[in-house]
């Protein structure tokens, strides 16, 4: 039921976005929810890369170690030139949106809001978090949200406590992070978007360029054997060919309008046993005390030697 409500809510957001802001540029992390059981393939690739083909830098900052039942911040950085705009679905220039996915280790989850500090509340204003699925609460999605306001996305994370969950152990864990800016080049259905390069469907000469539906252009290539093959270029990408041009199969016939891209990385966090920390502090205290005692003893001996005239 929860998954159904989540899907319905996501669909409602999409519908409202489409009808209220048709010129917007979206980066939909939740599309992966509808098409993949897991956001990470066996090869390690995060599935967002199947639609967002361009590679762009994504960075992440997490603490080196955390204590059980503590809240910490995982920060995903999605840098890009905010002065750049991209093609919307209607061919107009629109600001980029961003999205991110953080795959936490089992047991780590989004921190409940009553555990958020004032700093975290301020840093996450306007950001909405979604679990990937009911059985994967450790995978958290964000987006689409305005990129010019959220080049850094803060994920408040609650560390598990092995004292209350026997399936959790102290030690080092991997975190998988993905960050995207802008629209994809391929829809989940496999169809190209208008935010990509279109290529010649065959070798031959361009015999016609005719207007299509919704501002599209239909490019016809006549091959050497007389066959005519068409390629429909949607509104947005600029044509690089004219009637009479000779093209090779697979050669670009439009520019590349994409200015966004996806990036992923792996990082690590240590779930630290507080007993080890207390033991280490006790050891350091013992060493410091021993050094102090040695210094005091040395001075005492020096005083005795001075009194005896040695």
From Swiss-Prot:
Membrane-spanning ranges: 277-297
Note describing how the cofactor binds: Binds 1 heme group covalently.
Binding site for heme: 28, 48, 51-52
Primary localization: membrane
Superkingdom of source: Bacteria
Residues spanning the signal sequence: 1-23
GO molecular function, one term: iron ion binding
Pfam families per UniProt: Apocytochr_F_C (PF01333), Apocytochr_F_N (PF16639)
Annotated keywords: Electron transport, Heme, Iron, Membrane, Metal-binding, Photosynthesis, Signal, Thylakoid, Transmembrane, Transmembrane helix, Transport
Membrane topology term: Single-pass membrane protein
Gene Ontology biological-process annotations: photosynthesis
GO CC aspect terms: plasma membrane-derived thylakoid membrane
Cofactor: heme
Location in or out of the cell: Cellular thylakoid membrane
InterPro entries linked to this entry: Cyt-f_TM, Cyt_f, Cyt_f_lg_dom, Cyt_f_lg_dom_sf, Rudment_hybrid_motif
PANTHER family the record matches: CYTOCHROME F (PTHR33288:SF10), PTHR33288
Protein family membership: Belongs to the cytochrome f family.
Record's function text: Component of the cytochrome b6-f complex, which mediates electron transfer between photosystem II (PSII) and photosystem I (PSI), cyclic electron flow around PSI, and state transitions.
Assembly description: The 4 large subunits of the cytochrome b6-f complex are cytochrome b6, subunit IV (17 kDa polypeptide, PetD), cytochrome f and the Rieske protein, while the 4 small subunits are PetG, PetL, PetM and PetN. The complex functions as a dimer.
Stated name of the protein: Cytochrome f
Primary gene name: petA
